Every structure is written in C-alpha cells, then in structure tokens.
C-alpha cells in the first residue's frame, strides 16, 4: 500500500510544492510500521526504499530527493545532487527540480523558501540544534534578508509529553523562557519546540 501523503499549504510561491507523509500505508513492520523513511533507526533498508519510492512515484518526481544523515547538529550544507552524502541537519538548494527531504519524529521539520521561489531549504530542529543556533546559521547562509523568506513549521512532540531537565533549560533559556512551563517535579519543565522556533525566527526578522 502506498504511503499516504498530504500537500502542505504554506504560502510559498506556486512553483514550490511541499508534502508530508503520514503513518498510513508503507511497507515497514513492527515498531517502524508502516511508513518509516529513515535508514538510521534499524528498519529493513528494503522496506525503507519501498516507502521512499512510493512517494517518488506518487509525486512523479524527475529526481530522487536529497535525504540528509541527521545527527542533531547545527550544520548547514548546500545540496547539489540526490547522491550527496550530507551529514547535517539542514540543507538548501538553488537547483530547479531537486527535491529536499527532512525526517522527523519528536523534532521539528521546518521548510523554507525564498519569496521568488529560486531557493528552498529544510531544517531538522531538535533542542540541540535550536540551542546551537541551527535556524540562525541557516538564515545566514540562505538569505541576506530574512523578510524574504516563507516558512512552514511542521508537527512535533506535544509540550505536555516533552519534559526536559535543568541542563537543557539552561541552554535554551538564553534565547527566552517563554516556551517553558513547570511540571510537578522540581528541576523539570515542559518544552514547546515549535514556540522556540517561532521566537528565534521572530528575533531573526
């Protein structure tokens, strides 16, 4: 069964089209059921390949997407070919017809396009990347004017289910404390990753 995909409405130029996959459909089994796209979590590579090919077929892509090897870093790379072995958590391209992919579970998937539609980028943003400035570094590489960007922030772990400790609080509180809420336990907070990203983007202009 093909992986179910849904089109993203995010205000990007008409020539920029984005989709996200769901857990419906696909060939992965067990804990990975059923539409896992990652080759780095222990799933059967053949099943992952089928899942990826399902999306390529449905979207009638001329080129395979660029998949990053995501490592929870703040590294930004330029993508030039589907065969690029990009070890990073953010990439961008100016090559027409070259799709970019970002994988996420608890972390934030962020899509970015220039207003003229000549450049696109993706960011995989967890707390480590956000604390290390991945959004700021991406914008510095991507655009001279942050106001020239169209941004979509995708789904991530719900704040009620995301509890962090003092070490993470200390790192992210340098940005703001608005995205934390206290838990019943001493030294523990709920963290709203999406709110973190929104505050950083607002600070960047």
Language-model-detected regions and their locations in the chain:
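Active-site microenvironment for binding and transforming phosphate-containing groups
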Residues: 1-205
């Amino acid at each position: 069964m093909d992986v179910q995909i849904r089109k993203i409405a995010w205000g990007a130029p008409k020539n920029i089209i984005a989709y996200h996959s769901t857990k419906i459909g696909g060939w992965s089994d067990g804990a990975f059921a059923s539409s896992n796209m990652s080759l780095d979590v222990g799933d059967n590579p053949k099943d992952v390949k089928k899942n990826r090919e399902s999306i390529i077929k449905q979207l009638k892509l001329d080129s395979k997407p660029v998949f990053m090897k995501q490592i929870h870093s703040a590294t930004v790379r330029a993508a030039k070919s589907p065969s690029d072995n990009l070890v990073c958590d953010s990439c961008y391209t100016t090559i027409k017809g070259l799709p970019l992919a970002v994988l996420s579970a608890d972390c934030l998937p962020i899509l970015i396009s220039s207003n003229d539609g000549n450049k696109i980028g993706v960011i995989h943003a967890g707390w480590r990347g956000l604390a290390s400035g991945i959004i700021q570094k991406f914008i510095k590489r991507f655009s001279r004017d942050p106001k020239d960007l169209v941004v979509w922030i995708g789904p991530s772990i719900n704040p009620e289910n995301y509890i962090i400790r003092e070490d993470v609080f200390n790192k992210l509180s340098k940005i703001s404390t608005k995205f934390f809420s206290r838990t019943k336990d001493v030294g523990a907070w709920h963290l709203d990753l999406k709110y973190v990203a929104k505050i950083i983007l607002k600070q960047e202009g």
